[in-house]
């Protein structure tokens, strides 16, 4: 992520005060673990695989993707941050513990996002 942040000139954007604050990002993946780097910024969660109410990630990929987008870097003293560390995140679990899923679950997830725009 750090190399990508350099390649896309994140620091120049940050110096203008743009951090992603006020922007909501939906991540349709394997779920999300409420990691220190994502603390207080996960604003919504829906599970179309096991229908659980509380956020979880039984694979790790969804958490990794969310951190690449909006991780604060808090667990590593700011060293590894996402590209938009101020954004809000909505996690929609549409993939199972192996990373497999159904197109119908992805479509259900997209519909859920559309009907919960207030989180974004």
Feature map (PLM): residue ranges:
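Autoinhibitory propeptides
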Residues: 1-16
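Short, well-ordered amphipathic alpha-helical segments that serve as non-catalytic structural scaffolds
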Residues: 5-8, 72, 107-110
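Subtilisin-like serine protease catalytic core
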Residues: 12-44, 52-104, 120
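Short acidic, glycine-rich surface-loop motifs adjacent to enzyme active sites
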Residues: 110-120
């Amino acid at each position: 992520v750090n190399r990508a942040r350099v390649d896309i000139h994140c620091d120049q954007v940050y110096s203008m005060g743009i951090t992603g604050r006020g922007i909501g990002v939906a991540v349709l993946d394997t779920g999300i673990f409420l990691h220190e780097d994502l603390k207080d910024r996960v604003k919504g969660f829906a599970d179309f695989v096991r229908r659980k109410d509380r956020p979880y990630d039984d694979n790790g990929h969804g958490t990794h993707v969310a951190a690449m987008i909006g991780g604060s870097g808090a667990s590593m003293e700011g060293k590894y941050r996402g590209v938009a560390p101020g954004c809000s995140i909505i996690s929609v679990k549409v993939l199972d513990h192996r990373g497999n899923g159904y197109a119908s679950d992805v479509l259900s997830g997209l519909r859920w996002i559309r009907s919960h725009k207030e989180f974004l």
